[in-house]
UniProtKB/Swiss-Prot annotation:
The gene is nadK. Involved in the regulation of the intracellular balance of NAD and NADP, and is a key enzyme in the biosynthesis of NADP. Catalyzes specifically the phosphorylation on 2'-hydroxyl of the adenosine moiety of NAD to yield NADP. NAD(+) binds at D68, G69, N142, D143, R153, R170, D172, Q242. The lineage of its organism: Bacteria, Pseudomonadati, Acidobacteriota, Terriglobia, Terriglobales. This is NAD kinase. GO terms for molecular function: ATP binding; metal ion binding; NAD binding; NAD+ kinase activity.
Length: 285
């Protein structure tokens, strides 16, 4: 039987009625739905699997019910599987989760009839190295960020590109983002907007203490190294704004384009700039 995984956002009242309806539709169309532990707080009408274990169920599709944050979490869970994701917007902005709730079943019908398009989004591979040893590694859809905690003191950073020095500087932090992440935190820090199909990465210093240091766009196959030369206490590496690890002086963050991509299900021809105009009011006066 064809299997579909369902991932939900916590504390969304509308899911109490939506999830049973969705599961009934999936059962009625011959699918075997499995739900994550958060979706299980709204219904028990499907088999419950911890979110981290859902890839082991080998679903053909993942349905994400929530906002962009829920999609980012799902993308990391399924990063190495290549399973397409249908993301339904139950959040506020929904820049990535662009499918409105009213179009959910139209998209599912399209999926069942093999009429959907698959849009691939590049991911970022990040490794944290300490004293020459790898501490952890992540795949990110939006970005990885080095940022300070409560103490209002800047950090000292050094960026190398393919082994060559780019700049050494003081700043509140640094954002390294994918083209998808160019419309997230990097944009708020005056970074450029990149179309999702551009083969590039963005390095955006946060409040650098240099008038001449500006965001940098580098080739997609670049090997970026961010060295933490000096930082205040409670400085963290954050992945997609959701996973964090405390940093130490001398830590190195190595970033490059991931070998994995996120596959987003689309029905129709809504373009990136259509979404920019609709969601971010791009070009309006």
């Amino acid at each position: 039987m064809r299997r579909i995984a369902v991932i939900a956002k916590p504390q969304k009242d509308e899911l109490a009625s939506l999830l049973p309806e969705l599961l009934a539709w999936l059962h009625g169309h011959g699918y075997d739905p499995v739900i994550d532990d958060i979706a299980a707080t709204y219904t028990s009408e499907a088999r419950i699997v911890p979110r981290a274990d859902l890839p082991n169920e080998n679903p053909e599709l993942v349905i994400v019910l929530g906002g962009d944050g829920t999609l980012l979490a799902a993308a990391r869970v399924f990063a190495k599987t290549g399973v397409p994701i249908l993301s339904v917007n139950l959040g506020s902005l929904g820049f990535l989760t662009e499918v409105p709730l009213g179009d959910l079943y139209r998209h599912l019908e399209g999926w069942a009839q093999n009429c959907c398009n698959i849009e691939q989004r590049a991911m970022l591979h990040c490794e944290l190295r300490r004293d020459g040893h790898q501490v952890c590694e992540y795949e990110a859809l939006n970005d990885v960020v080095v940022s300070k905690g409560a103490i209002a003191r800047m950090g000292d950073f050094r960026i190398d590109l393919d082994g060559a020095l780019v700049a050494a500087f003081r700043a509140d932090g640094v954002i390294i983002s994918t083209p998808t992440g160019s419309t997230a935190y990097s944009l708020a820090a005056n970074g450029p907007i990149l179309a999702p199909n551009v083969d590039a990465l963005i390095v955006t210093p946060v409040c650098p203490h240099l008038l001449t240091l500006r965001p940098l766009v580098v080739q997609g196959n670049a090997d970026l190294k961010l060295k933490v030369a000096g930082i205040p206490d409670q400085t963290y590496l954050t992945v997609d704004g959701q996973e964090a690890i405390a940093l130490c002086v001398g830590d190195e963050i190595h970033c490059r384009k991931s070998v994995y991509t996120v596959k987003l299900v689309r029905l129709g021809s809504t373009g990136f700039f259509d979404v920019l105009r609709a969601k971010l009011k791009w070009g309006e006066r």
